[in-house]
Amino acid sequence: MVNDDTVEDSNVLMSTMHNKPRPGHYRLQEGVRIVSQDGSALVVCDYPLRVVQLNPVAAQLLLLCIEERTCGQLAQATGMPVNRVETFCDQLCWKGLLEAGPLLPPPTWPCVSIVIPSYNRAKELERCLYSLFSLDYPASCLEIIVVDDASTDETGSMLQRLAQEVATRDQELHVIRHEQQRGVGISRNTGAEAAQYGLVAYLDSDCVASPGWLRELVPTFQDTRIAAVGGMIRAYDRNTLLGSYEDVCSSLYMGERTQQVSLKGPLTYLPSANMLVRRMVWEKLAGFAAMTQGEDVDFCWRLLTSGASMNYVPRGVIYHDYRTTLGAFLCIRAAYASAEAALIKHHPTERRILLLPPEQAFFAASIIGGVWGITRLTWQSIWSGFQGMAIAIALLPLLLALLMLLFGTFKRIQKMRNFPIAIEFPIIFKATLRGYMAYMYHLSRHLTRYYTLLLLIVSFFLPPVFILLLILCGIVIGVDYVRLRPLMDIGRYALCSLLDDCAYEAGVVWGCMKHREWKPLVPIIKTKV
């Protein structure tokens, strides 16, 4: 059964609803069209523009999902087993063809051990624990394990007081104290070793859990293939400049889209500040490594290398109390970045990749070069008068960029002729332009993240390089400001972003010197996307 929503051609079907599907339901992703012709079916995605030939099973499922359907309804309509339908639908979701609603809760909620490592954060830890006492989750299915990593503040007395308080409730609070400081990774391992339940939830002591935190993440484990899941991390206090910046620009913020974590995908790890793991998987991997920084990245990479699966579900939200003084902000950024060298030593195959596909790279270089030339000549004309011929020459790279854009468009048109479907020129042109512009952002982000300080130093000796740096930063800051929607004006956002990049690059260099490993500064160049 399908509804009567059609566009132009009666053989072209697509979903017209934009709200999220209901829990346990699947629906055709917005911007996806199904074209039925001569007994075959094609799916057309607007962004990124692609045409995919469908096998009969996928075609039937997608057609049914023009209206919201559950796995049970799809299984009944297709005659397939429910588990096979669920697997197939999940694959279509990861490919961007279907959209899934929130998972249905399990018949009975599984028990969870929450592990919180802490060092000298008595006030923050108390706030964190009270948020856990208010979770919308059966208290009888929870145990909270605090690992005090040899704190010297009021942590001990505060925990004794809370232990007496929860003793009168149906809640479990266990405290384990290290006699000497051993680090956050080892502290997480200590807590997991003491855990009595099959699911271990890691939470940092300076975080506050939302009431529905576990209810949103735990249902993911109904899929036995999932070894770990993480949720969204937002800023606890967004009323400060750095707090509002960290809210959407922190390395802990993974976006608002449900994703599958993959070593080759856009999301390669989950922060351990908000992560649930099957205890048997933690045991198999021998826990977290004894690293001062980057232990969560290392754990995720080892988990993925073992063949296990990991998902990111942004609905499971916690709030992180970021350090909002400038010195602390810069030091933390540099410390995070310094882990890159250690991670490369442990995972030599996970090198940073710089994509340089010829067409996209030529387009980006032409646009950036053209803007650089015009900016430089405009500045010079202020002092030496207008130079028409020089401006005309500076416009040449922009003309070359336009020619490359047209070349890429007609190249796509030729590819589309292999399919029995006509896609209008404006759609293909727009998709090509969007892809080229996205690559220009990718290239600019790569250069500003790792080479801002270097370009600043070089610009003292070669001033035109400073114009290039301004253009690269302008591209990145402009795109990110629109994409992330931070709660601040663009001027303050630009300042925070520049300080962020400088601190990060300094941290990478410091880590390279510390570990005598320079590969983080030298990417692997690939010419194929």
Q: Over which residues does each language-model region extend?
A:
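N-proximal low-complexity "stem/linker" segments adjacent to membrane-targeting elements
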Residues: 47-56, 61, 79-131
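A conserved acidic beta->alpha catalytic loop
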Residues: 148-157, 180, 207
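Glycine-rich, basic loop-to-helix element that forms the pyrophosphate-binding segment
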Residues: 178-195, 216, 261-265
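Active-site-adjacent helix/loop segment of glycosyltransferases
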Residues: 313-376, 411-493, 497-500, 506-510, ...
